[in-house]
A protein has these predicted regions:
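Acidic, metal/ion-coordinating pockets
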Residues: 2-210
Length: 210
């Protein structure tokens, strides 16, 4: 593992996840936080599948029930009503319609190019993303060129560049396994405090099947 990351034990990870889950379950959400409380709204997208615009590329006609552009207005509305918020993507954004195939097989991705989906996600101001199985459909070189255009980090803890090491903490990971971001959040009285928020991602083992 790269020296940039300190290994974390499975027990520590599970303990932290259990604590976070309990805190969420025991803390009812209200529209406005109390003076000694702060709410953080986590927004998540998944399975974008290159659907940037409200357009059905298979039917070759507009479809106002789909597209990241429609989601953008919802994201803006949530940010407007939330004192603190973050935007996360769960993966499967790179493949899934004819526009994705055109970029991969016809236009291609040169160094410095920004994929249309990544360009849209940059505009929306994503904080972090992870990979799905369909990010690998066009090969690793294409995927890395696409990820290079993102203005936000990607994490994946179980993607290695070769054989697994006997010691899991020494696996040669392809991208950073996790991220701990320090954010400044505002409570109900307007007081600001720093908090650390952790993100970790995993890909399914069936990548070569799907």
């Amino acid at each position: 593992m790269s020296a940039l990351f300190e290994p974390i034990s499975r027990r520590t990870l599970l303990r932290g996840m259990a604590t976070a889950t309990a805190m969420v379950a025991l803390h009812p959400f209200s529209a406005r936080a109390a003076g000694n409380q702060a709410h953080l709204r986590l927004m998540e997208t998944t399975d974008i599948h290159v659907n940037v615009f409200p357009y059905d590329y298979y039917a070759d006609k507009p479809n106002d029930t789909m597209g990241l552009a429609r989601t953008a207005s919802i994201i803006d509305a949530i940010r407007a009503e939330s004192t603190n918020s973050m935007l996360i993507d769960n993966g499967d954004f790179l493949q899934g319609n004819p526009m994705g195939d055109y970029i991969a097989y016809e236009r291609g991705m040169q160094d410095g190019d920004v994929h249309p989906v990544i360009k849209a996600m940059n505009v929306l101001g994503y904080d972090v993303g992870t990979l799905g199985n369909h990010e690998f459909n066009y090969g690793l070189d294409f995927m890395h060129k696409v990820l290079a255009g993102a203005n936000f980090p990607y994490v994946c803890a179980n993607l290695t560049t070769g054989a697994l090491a006997d010691d899991p903490t020494k696996d040669d990971l392809m991208i950073r396994p996790y991220l701990i971001q320090e954010q400044t959040i505002t409570d109900g009285d307007g007081n600001k405090s720093p908090v650390k928020i952790g993100f970790i991602g995993f890909v399914p083992p069936q990548i070569m099947v799907w």
